[in-house]
Amino acid sequence: MTQISRQQYADLYGPTIGDKIRLGDSDLYVEIEKDLRATYGDELQYGGGKTLRDGMGSENFLTQEAGCLDLVITNVTVIDAIQGVVKADVGIRNGRIVGLGKAGNPSTKDGVTRGLVTGASTDAISGEHLILTAGGMDTHVHYIAPQQVEAALSNGITTLWGGGIGPVDGTNGVTTTNGPWNLEMMLRSIEGLPINFGIQGKGNSTGIAPLIEQLEAGAAGFKVHEDYGATPATIRACLSVADEYDVSVAVHTDTLNESGYVEDTIAAFDGRSVHTYHSEGAGGGHAPDLLKVVGQNNILPSSTNPTLPCGKNSVAELFDMIMVCHNLNPKIPSDVAFAESRVRAETIVAESVLHDMGAISMIGSDSQAMGRLGETFLRAIQTADAMKKARGPLPEDAPGNDNFRVLRYIAKVTINPALTAGVGDVIGSIESGKFADLVLWEPAFFGVKPKLVLKGGLVAWANMGDPNASLPTPQPMYYRPMFAAYGSALQKTSITFVSRAAYDKGVADRFGLQRLVMPVSGTRVIGKAHMVRNSYLPNIEVDPQTFAVKVDGVHATVKPPQSISLNQLYFFS
């Protein structure tokens, strides 16, 4: 058999088992652990003189109806919280992932994976020198402006979870869409936006009826926020309805400790599943020791990207953010004290360490309300790199690569938010049967700027050159909406998630919705143990005077980095 060098093979088909890929300008390196394409020398490849030709890699007679793929991504490196770091062909049909393995024509190729047959119905993406991830999910979004969708897609985020009705003061501070009329208007509005949505209703009600009517009107979950009163009674009432209707509850706790301390809020949870937003506390919540929630097995903790990674300017920018978002007045001493109580350098530094240990399970943005929606994926990878430089290799990492650490951070922005919201059976990972929301990255731009964003198996967003040019690549190159973002294709490639109650009551027909509408499920049985690669339950102590954080008795701190990877090299501003 003819042999070629490893370098020549990588030039032709991309890296394979044992090869390492540097992620951007970071110090993170992933190593391909497994090659799912069975054997070498029979690779499927698109192009002139390549193998994806009729009678060669392309099967002659199989129709799409009979199982021929719609799209194949060839020879791509997959980085996925469930699959690991693997080399594979990835097949897509009818907007769903068929599987990973070896694609092609079983009449001419050995070892073609069942279901991954290519033919006349199949188009191709050459993944040889690209990285494939699941589309990201931002679990903490204030729906302040519809243009947020453009920022999200430009960083590989394909699902938004939050609430609001636009740039009103309530939405500037709280991620809820309050009441049936507002929910209906938002469900109608997002029909034209090429991204998945889940809308949270206002959970701040000790009365049951206002909560139920929001679920029946299309809310996919609840958010309890201190600006509307995050009291133990409110939390208990909201969780009781959530238990009955199988929806998630997110909570922004009581910064001022007016209705109780962190221990009282934890007691109000009563062991029930709950998602704690910005669990460090700079974004809001019990001061100064909200971090204790990350040690509870029923609590699914996330934090938000403005403090990740903790850099030399992180603390300085937070005060003004808080004043604007929560309608505070710098001339009122109590308002200033409120803002200052949330900004604690020690707990902000500890937040990054706890992420690195897998104790905080998710990262969201807190979009336009202290966070940056277009940087969620970016901040995850930046934090992973900053922590490697500060703390060294993780115990779980194999010698010579950072696979476990990278996969831990990928899980924080893909599968764990999906599981928490009750949509992990539909999105969040690259698994057979899941919706084909996928992101392709050039390794040099990993986590920063994707090459292609697929929604439901069709390209929705891409870095595209001059449409009048002779090639796709001439300048000016910038992100533009693609065909999945137009016409009725948009409605077949993006999902609106709602409660089962709304789904069963025909919310799509009632409101004339044309998008795919799917119910959430399984939210009340999720605990910290279900958080992929991020299930650590430490004992947390916070010194009330110095705010120093101890994790299992050890001071959790690092020096804030003076420079951060994937940063100014990649952006003009």
From Swiss-Prot:
Active site, renumbered: H326 (proton donor)
Pathway: Nitrogen metabolism; urea degradation; CO(2) and NH(3) from urea (urease route): step 1/1
GO MF annotations, alphabetized: nickel cation binding; urease activity
Domain Urease intervals: 135-573
Binding-site residues, Ni(2+) 1: H140, H142, K223, D366
Main location: cytoplasm
Keywords of the record: Cytoplasm, Hydrolase, Metal-binding, Nickel
Protein name: Urease subunit alpha 2
